[in-house]
């Protein structure tokens, strides 16, 4: 292909149609023969120059020789232009910077959410990029950050922007997904088989429309989850596995309208105090999310309608029960689902993407301590004191097993009760300051005030009284 391009660029390479002998050729320097625009630079076209030859017989090359030199120059130009969307070396350096941020700010949950919300707008029914949404870096624009589902993500962008400024050779789309996967791994989760090379959108007009991300409290939670995730091309197993990432993080009523302002697990941090978490150790990635939803023993732990649906819906429940019992199975399925989610809608350059997994595996970062020398004698045995059995915690909501005596079941053993969701935390008791101001403004717009109730509508009261009297008269008359 490069030779054909060179031939089209150099008309001298085509044979002359004239049958008569050509006139004597003027001597052309090598610089003139090889000087043409190549790879784009800030200073204009890059020109390949060499010093004029001291030997005329070598400087005056044949037409085929000049064509070959031009073709080789085009090949060199094309090879230099074939650069991936992101630089692999800069991505690796950015990953180290992300790890340092995670250690100091405990921002694992919001980094996971950043990557998810950039890719979760994908619509498999739309082929064109970027109209189809997905992992394209559009979340950096205010037009998309202002979507209701993205409340609070401006804080994640503030943390990640200095890294983007430091490494301009990587795209936002890659950086968001790199931060998300790194946060999972640093929190103790599985290694995500990621690939990179995502291309960024360039304008706010390319942002997807609002309403493609899942809602926490839909009217029919299971149907809503399927509607949103099926649109992305994900199945029931992937829905449940990805939901398990709620083992990290908290819900804040001033952002989502859900959860308590604080609990015994969040009032002292780490990070910014407050909010309600799904799990006790909400910065540790494990399968506690599924265990805690199933047991429902602690009212300080959050259960959204979409969380409860995982144990209420028959198809979801198969996977939720499995993950509650088998953390290894959860890690495996989650890693695959996360990698798939991070690729949704992305346009890769190169088309196949590239991996950063050419360095030691994660397990090798923290090597196990060396075993004690064989010659060292074992310590004397210590008599263990038998601890008292822990007092069982009563199940107050959503008990998995009925507590009624066998006599109430005609002598049969107690039967499991259907899963009952915990009391949903609608967050209506604690409104954010902005919401309070909005409600107050609307209230005052109708003529009311905090110190003065709305005046009665006397005309409406009279009409209601007349209507009531007319109704009574009709009854008495009949």
UniProtKB/Swiss-Prot annotation:
Which Gene3D superfamilies does this one have?
1.10.520.10, Peroxidase, domain 2
Protein name as it appears in the record: Probable L-ascorbate peroxidase 8, chloroplastic
Induction line:
Induced by salt stress, abscisic acid (ABA), sodium nitrate and hydrogen peroxide in roots. Induced by infection with the bacterial pathogen Xanthomonas oryzae pv. oryzae (Xoo). Down-regulated by salt stress in leaves. Down-regulated by hydrogen peroxide in leaves.
Supply any other comment. Answer: Binds one cation per subunit; probably K(+), but might also be Ca(2+). Plants over-expressing APX8 exhibit increased tolerance to the bacterial pathogen Xanthomonas oryzae pv. oryzae (Xoo). Plants silencing APX8 show increased sensitivity to Xoo.
**Molecular function as annotated in GO:** heme binding; L-ascorbate peroxidase activity; metal ion binding; peroxidase activity
Q: What does this protein do?
A: Involved in defense response and tolerance to the bacterial pathogen Xanthomonas oryzae pv. oryzae (Xoo). Plays an important role in hydrogen peroxide removal during infection by Xoo. Involved in response to abiotic stress. Plays a role in hydrogen peroxide removal durings salt stress.
Q: Where, by residue number, does K(+) bind?
A: 247, 279, 286
The Gene Ontology biological process terms listed for this entry are: cellular response to oxidative stress; defense response; hydrogen peroxide catabolic process; response to reactive oxygen species
* InterPro entries per UniProt: Ccp1-like (IPR044831), Haem_peroxidase (IPR002016), Haem_peroxidase_sf (IPR010255), Peroxidase_I (IPR002207), Peroxidases_heam-ligand_BS (IPR019793)
UniProt lists the gene as APX8
Taxonomic path? Eukaryota, Viridiplantae, Streptophyta, Embryophyta, Tracheophyta
Q: Which organism is it from?
A: Oryza sativa subsp. japonica (Rice)
């Amino acid at each position: 292909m490069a030779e054909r391009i060179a031939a089209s660029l150099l008309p001298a390479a085509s044979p002359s149609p004239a049958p008569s002998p050509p006139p004597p050729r003027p001597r052309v320097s090598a610089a003139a023969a090889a000087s043409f625009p190549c790879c784009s630079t800030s200073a204009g076209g890059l020109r390949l120059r060499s010093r004029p030859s001291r030997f005329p017989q070598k400087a005056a090359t044949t037409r085929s020789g000049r064509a070959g030199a031009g073709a080789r120059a085009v090949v060199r130009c094309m090879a230099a232009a074939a650069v991936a969307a992101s630089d692999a070396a800069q991505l690796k350096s950015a990953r180290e910077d992300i790890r340092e941020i995670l250690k100091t700010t405990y921002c694992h949950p919001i980094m996971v959410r950043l990557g998810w919300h950039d890719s979760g707008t994908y619509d498999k029914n739309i082929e064109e990029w970027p109209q189809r949404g997905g992992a394209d870096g559009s979340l950096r624009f205010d037009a998309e950050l202002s979507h209701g589902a993205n409340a609070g993500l401006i804080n994640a962008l503030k943390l990640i922007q200095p890294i983007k400024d430091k490494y301009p050779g990587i795209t936002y789309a890659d950086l968001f997904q790199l931060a998300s996967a790194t946060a999972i791994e640093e929190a103790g989760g599985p290694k995500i088989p990621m690939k990179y090379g995502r291309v960024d959108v360039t304008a706010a007009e390319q942002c997807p429309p609002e309403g493609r991300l899942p809602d926490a409290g839909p009217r029919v939670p299971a149907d809503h989850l399927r509607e949103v995730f099926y649109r992305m091309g994900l199945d029931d197993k992937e829905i449940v596995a990805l939901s398990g990432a709620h083992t990290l993080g908290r819900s804040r009523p001033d952002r989502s309208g859900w959860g308590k302002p604080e609990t015994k697990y969040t009032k002292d941090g780490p990070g910014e105090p407050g909010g309600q978490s799904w799990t006790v150790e909400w910065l540790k990635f494990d399968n506690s999310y599924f265990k805690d939803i199933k047991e429902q023993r602690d009212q300080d732990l959050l259960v959204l309608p979409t969380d409860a649906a995982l144990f209420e819906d028959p198809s979801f429940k198969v996977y939720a029960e499995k993950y509650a019992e088998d953390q290894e199975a959860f890690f495996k399925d989650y890693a695959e689902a996360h990698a798939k989610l991070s690729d949704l809608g992305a346009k890769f350059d190169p088309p196949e993407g590239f991996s950063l997994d050419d360095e030691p595996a994660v397990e090798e970062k923290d090597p196990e301590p060396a075993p004690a020398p064989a010659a060292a004698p074992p310590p004397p045995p210590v008599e263990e004191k038998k601890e008292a059995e822990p007092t069982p915690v009563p199940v107050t909501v959503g008990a998995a097993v009925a507590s009624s005596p066998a006599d109430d079941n005609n002598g049969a053993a107690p039967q499991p009760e259907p899963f009952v969701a915990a009391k949903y935390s609608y967050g209506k008791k604690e409104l954010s300051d902005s919401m309070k101001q909005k409600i107050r403004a609307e209230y005052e717009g109708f003529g009311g005030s905090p110190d003065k109730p709305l005046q009665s509508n006397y005309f409406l009261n009279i009409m209601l009284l007349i209507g009531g009297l007319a109704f009574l008269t009709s009854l008495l008359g009949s």
